[in-house]
Amino acid sequence: MPVVNLRLYGAFREIERVAPDLVAAHARKQAALKAIKVLYRDAIVSAIAGVQKAWAQRRERACPWFQQAIRHLQQVDELFLAEADRLHDQFAETERPLSHPAVESVRGAILDRLSGCSALLIAGGHVGVLRNRMSFFGLDEALRQKPIIAWSGGAMVLAERILLYHDHTTHGVGLAEYLDRGFGLVPGVVFLPHAEQRLELSRPENVAILAARLAPLRPVALENGGGIDAHGQCFGRADAIRELTVDGHLAPYDPAHRTAGGDDAARS
């Protein structure tokens, strides 16, 4: 069966060539978002320090000080996402990119290629660029019309929110932060591909804090050799798909707790 490349990156390059004013407005929006992320990261540092201090003093999830610290951290996350929403909405209302003749033409060609496909494969790569290009061309609704097989960063964009995370960085321990909202095709979860490589999952406090922070969304670790189908059923390696719990453990992913989503499958 032939594979058709939707060529989203090349499509955006074409928009850069024929609609420089629109692309400049998009770049200004992205620059404003980057500036907000600087404030967001500064706020995260302080908020996470409070969470870790409360956990260290009383290693109980029910500790009211820990719960309050988690709520503060969640408020920081929500503030960032609200600011990101504001910038995206402002750009859409002011520039109306999907109504721009150049975007209509290029987007139409993308949708024509997609219409002839029996399924959509979404690979990984730079999840931020992937999410931005898909969003720029308004592929949200088109994603719901096809069976999807996605892995790594491709799986991340299908969830409600996209979390960047890495406990092992060149400058020490990294801090998890939201990149943006995902497309919400798989509700109720945040996907964490290659979590074993990127997170200190052997430390119960790390697992518990991240799970508490993301609640009520469920953090699901995706490892090589396994996946989740459209009905929430896991396949492949039994230990490849696990959920981080607020008790500090990794548990088998339980589809009974998952809200039904679209026809999609996520893999590491």
Question: What residues fall within each predicted segment?
Answer:
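Class I SAM-dependent methyltransferase SAM-binding "motif I" and its flanking Rossmann-like core
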Residues: 113, 123-126, 131-202
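Active-site periphery "cap/insert" segments of enzyme catalytic domains
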Residues: 63-143
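C-terminal and late-domain segments of enzyme folds
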Residues: 1, 5-77, 164, 168-268
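Beta-sheet entry/capping signal
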Residues: 119-120, 147-148, 218
